[in-house]
């Protein structure tokens, strides 16, 4: 029987609560993020896990962390999440190219890695509501840099007892990402563009979450907020699964021997995906280095190099927009863990970040980051990587994966480390068609993104994913754009408050 795991806020104002309560709440009342009181070790060996499919692996990982869900509840959630919505039975296949293993996390309904967690979150959430006798309708409030929004909308559309509101930076997502969101069906969905960047959207959402007056108004009308962003532990736990799965799969295929270390490279924005790899390592997966790959918004690269987190810098719009982030929310969980689970210290750092835009960690905390390596890739390096690997191997990747691939090349040059390496491939190249075509030297500004998708399909011999072809002529249903100061009004209008 797995030992119970309870969750508390990184900022410490809240006592321990069960997993289902943490998932329901999303963000702690003090603005902190929920973290487990201990990280359990895998109970089955990796050899045993290697005999399981993706769904079986998911159960083995999730039952250890979501301990108040019954076996029946978890298996129900897992079987409904990882089904024919994915275009491959493997759910997360691995491709080898140019000496690295690409863990493809984009085979779900919206062709981005967010599907891996957001296809199960609605089931975890509605199960949690039943378990906790929640009387209110759950309002999912989400900020997106492009991918989370669509994946959350697809997951929650027409789910009884829920509504979903997504804010995105009007001028900070790719045309295909925007088209995916604004054509979303479902009577319970609301998509709003904001005049501002992703950090503005995320800060606005966090503010709404912690607004006590608004919470009271909502409660009176039978609503309560929760989150589909990676601040929700229900997003993070399912992401641990694919790191366990990838190791077990490489083991099963004889590409590594039992116990061999692997390195993991993750293109990083909000720090959730790489934090899941850190948790997988702490659960017993032999991961050596956790290589954190940034684009030109290299606040995390600087943090790993100097120990200072400083968001006081220019926000750069890049060809990897899901990583255009200067306030990396999930880093707070890592700060909490490396401070020795010290909530007071974490709250102090986050206070400094809010007030001064920066903080510096202690030498002792820095010594606990030895397993992390921070790297970054410029736009040119990103584009060169897409082209070089495609011309050399025929393997096509999107801009975010290319950032990771470029950083991996730099890492091996710098260190000579030959450890087998898994690179998280986080989106289909068809989500960022224009940038990928530009990288291949076949860009054409006179053509639309869908026309370029046809050409990319021809060049790469890869079929256009259903997620792109189905939105070509879809009706635009969401046209609202507001200033970043008007987010509360927009929420109230949608909920009829």
Residue ranges and their predicted role:
Residues 1-497:
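PLP-dependent amino-acid enzyme catalytic core
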């Amino acid at each position: 029987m797995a030992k119970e795991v309870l969750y508390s806020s990184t900022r410490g104002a809240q006592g321990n609560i069960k997993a289902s309560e943490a998932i329901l709440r999303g963000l702690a009342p003090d603005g902190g993020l929920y973290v487990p009181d201990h990280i359990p070790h895998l109970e089955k060996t990796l050899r045993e896990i290697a005999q399981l499919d993706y769904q079986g692996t998911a159960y083995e990982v999730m039952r250890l962390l979501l301990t108040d869900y019954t076996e029946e509840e978890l298996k129900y959630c897992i079987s409904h999440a990882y089904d024919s919505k994915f275009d491959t039975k493997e759910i997360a296949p691995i491709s080898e190219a140019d000496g690295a293993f690409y863990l493809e996390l984009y085979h779900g309904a919206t062709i981005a890695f967010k599907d891996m967690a957001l296809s199960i979150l609605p089931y975890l959430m509605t199960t949690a509501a039943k378990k906790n006798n929640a009387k209110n309708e759950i309002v999912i409030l989400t900020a997106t840099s492009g991918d989370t929004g669509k994946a959350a909308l697809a997951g929650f559309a027409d789910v009884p007892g829920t509504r979903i509101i997504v804010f995105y930076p009007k001028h900070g997502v790719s045309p295909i990402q925007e088209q995916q969101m604004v054509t979303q069906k479902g009577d319970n969905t609301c998509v709003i563009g904001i005049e501002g960047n992703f950090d503005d959207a995320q800060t606005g959402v966090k503010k709404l979450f912690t607004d006590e007056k608004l919470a009271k108004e909502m409660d009176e009308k039978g609503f309560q907020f929760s989150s589909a962003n990676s601040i929700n532990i229900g997003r993070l736990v399912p992401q641990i699964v694919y790191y366990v799965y990838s190791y077990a799969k490489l083991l099963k295929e004889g590409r590594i021997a039992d116990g061999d270390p692997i390195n993991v490279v993750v293109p990083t924005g909000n720090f959730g995906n790489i934090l899941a790899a850190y948790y997988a390592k702490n659960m017993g997966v032999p991961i050596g280095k956790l290589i954190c790959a940034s684009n030109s918004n290299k606040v995390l690269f600087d943090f790993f190099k100097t120990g200072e987190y400083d968001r006081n810098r220019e926000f750069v719009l890049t060809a990897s927009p899901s990583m255009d982030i200067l306030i990396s929310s999930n880093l707070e969980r890592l700060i909490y863990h490396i401070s020795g689970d010290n909530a007071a210290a974490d709250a102090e750092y986050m206070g400094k970040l809010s007030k001064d835009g920066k903080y510096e960690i202690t030498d002792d905390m820095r010594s606990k980051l030895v397993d992390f390596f921070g790297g970054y890739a410029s736009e040119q390096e990103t584009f060169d990587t897409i082209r070089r690997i495609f011309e050399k191997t025929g393997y096509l990747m999107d801009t975010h994966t290319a950032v990771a691939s470029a950083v991996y090349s730099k890492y091996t040059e710098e260190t000579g480390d030959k450890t087998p390496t898994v690179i998280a491939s986080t989106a289909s190249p068809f989500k960022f068609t224009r940038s990928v075509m530009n990288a291949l030297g076949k860009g054409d500004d006179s053509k639309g993104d869908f026309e370029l998708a046809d050409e990319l399909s021809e060049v790469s011999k890869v079929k256009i994913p259903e997620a792109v072809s189905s939105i070509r002529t879809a009706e635009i249903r969401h046209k609202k754009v507001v200033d970043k100061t008007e987010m509360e009004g927009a929420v109230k209008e949608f909920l009829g408050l």
